[in-house]
Amino acid sequence: MHQPAIMQRALAVVALLAAAAAIAAAQGESPELLPFAVGAAPEGCDVGEGEWVFDEAARPWYAEEECPYIQPDLTCQAHGRPDAAYQRWRWQPRDCSLPSFNATGMLEMLRGKRMLFVGDSLLRGQYTSLLCLLHRGAPGGGGGSRSFETVDSLSIFRAKDYDATIEFYWAPMLAESNSDGAAVPDDRLIRGAPMNKHSSFWKGADVLVFNSYLWWMTGDKIQILRGADEDMSKDIVEMEAAEAYRLVLHQVTRWLEGNVDPKSARVFFVTASPSHAGAGGECYDQTTPVGAADAASYCGSTSRRMVQVAGEVLGASRVPVGVVNVTRMSELRRDAHTQVYREQRWAKPTAEQLAADPRSYADCTHWCLPGVPDAWNELLYWKLFFPARDEAI
């Protein structure tokens, strides 16, 4: 290995440890650390509460065109978005500051490890954001040192010089469902048990990050297939979405308790990403976040009931599940969705249709990259390396 590369990696780890030392100095004696942790977060720091600060000097972390991993439905600049200010907002927690994202340091901490994201297209956006952050902050050494492939439901990024993989597994409802394929069914049907099909891909992950919210929010009841019928059509009962969600999250926690060792692995749940798809496309033509004067009274569309269910079930897990709370911060960012500036995969309007009624074609659910998911990864980075003291083992 070349001497400059060794020095760069050493400095990256030193930077992480220096950040940990600064926090520890203010906190006194440190608790026993969780896997991957290098320090503990300051007491009373809720990184999910704060404000968006315009920071043209430090944001974005990377340019859209320089990241090879972004899907066409998230490349807003390439699809003609006329403004770019949505890329330049930095999340500032109310009572503390986030450490600077250190790409090389993160890869060093993941050396020889497997990090896996499991969930829906919103989590895939966060996964893609992380790959972009690592690509920009820790360029590969050439000679095929990085690779990326997608086979069916699994995407794998390999950082070969670190012997590390960062993966995404598509399971929008976590349990096996009729939403696992490319089609978007009108009704949601999930298998009540077991979780063998999906969870067989999850085993062995050293860092597991999962989410599930969007695909539950149809307004209709969820169909539950009981037993092991292969054609997904027999012995079906219906449940309210929140209770079906509870059922599946209980399955997930049981799987975690039987398959994850909290002394060597970490688990995180990313909270609901809000949609701003109100009547007439609430996000269309928005160019700034919800202002500070309106933020206190602004109430997003996120289902508080679903959030409550997730908190109750995951909070009772015997395997600690770190919560990455992105809901409130994202509710304030109605400006940062892909709107009409994306590849139109499903309903493909003509140019005339789009010009006549752009609001009806606006995607007010997914996020442009670079953008809001980068801030989610800053929170994940914080949680992974600087967990709260009450999360210590």
UniProtKB/Swiss-Prot annotation:
Ranges facing Cytoplasmic side: 1-9
Give Gene Ontology CC terms: Golgi apparatus; Golgi membrane
This protein's membrane topology, according to the annotation, is: Single-pass type II membrane protein
Q: Which residues lie on this side of the membrane: Lumenal?
A: 27-393
Task: Locate the motif DXXH motif.
Answer: 363-366
What is the tissue localization of expression for this protein?
Expressed in roots, leaves and stems.
Name its cellular compartments: Golgi apparatus membrane
Bilayer-crossing residues are: 10-26
Taken from the UniProt record, the cysteine pairs bridged by disulfide bonds within this chain are 45-96, 67-132, 76-368, 283-364
The protein's matches in PANTHER family, at most eight in alphabetical order, are given as: PROTEIN TRICHOME BIREFRINGENCE-LIKE 9-RELATED, XYLAN O-ACETYLTRANSFERASE 11-RELATED
Q: Which family does it belong to?
A: Belongs to the PC-esterase family. TBL subfamily.
Q: What does this protein do?
A: Probable xylan acetyltransferase required for 2-O- and 3-O-monoacetylation of xylosyl residues in xylan. Possesses extremely low activity in vitro.
> What is this protein's record name?
Probable xylan O-acetyltransferase 11
Give the originating organism: Oryza sativa subsp. japonica (Rice)
